[in-house]
């Protein structure tokens, strides 16, 4: 999930300012709603996870990531700032929906000191994937010409990564179900 979210945090503002001509302030105001939704989703994610488990959270979060990736394919130079705000909101809620439950699931099988070490490893992997996401997104954007088709290429990358993560996670959850 960090392979997508942090890359979008780099590309969407570049698109908004450089290609659409909106100011930094306009973009900042447009993202407030998504940020507030993200907080609400993060606060409720733990309770939902406790009641329903990882599967519904995973389906919802992955579905939101796929939706925001497809929405990115419809960006144009005339895209209204409201559409950009909605894309950001989908991405923010998707991130919040998946972040806490995946962390809990990743660390739930560990005991004592293993949990501390597991948390450190998990956080390190998140930081690495965040850096990789930013680098890959900007690399694709730059190599494709820093124009509208480059933005579409980045969102195709996001969609492919979302599908790959969904498939790998589904296989993992299926194998966990067989073991447990």
Give, region by region, the residue ranges found by the protein language model.
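12-transmembrane solute porter fold
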Residues: 1-177
């Amino acid at each position: 999930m960090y392979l997508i979210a942090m890359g979008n945090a780099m590309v969407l503002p570049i698109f908004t300012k450089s290609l659409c001509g909106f100011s930094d302030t306009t973009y900042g105001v447009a993202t407030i709603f998504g940020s507030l939704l993200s907080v609400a989703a993060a606060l409720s994610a733990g309770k939902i996870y406790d009641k329903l488990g990882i599967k519904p959270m995973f389906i919802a979060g992955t579905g939101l990531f796929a939706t925001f990736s497809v929405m990115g394919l419809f960006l144009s130079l005339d895209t209204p700032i409201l559409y950009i705000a909605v894309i950001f909101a989908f991405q923010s809620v998707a991130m919040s929906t998946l972040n806490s439950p995946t962390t809990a699931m990743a660390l739930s099988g560990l005991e004592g000191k293993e949990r501390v070490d597991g948390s450190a490893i998990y956080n390190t992997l998140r930081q690495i994937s965040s850096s990789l996401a930013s680098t890959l997104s900007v690399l694709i954007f730059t190599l494709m010409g820093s124009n509208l088709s480059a933005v579409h290429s980045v969102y195709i990358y996001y969609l492919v990564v979302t599908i790959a993560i969904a498939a790998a996670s589904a296989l993992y959850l299926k194998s966990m179900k067989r073991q447990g």
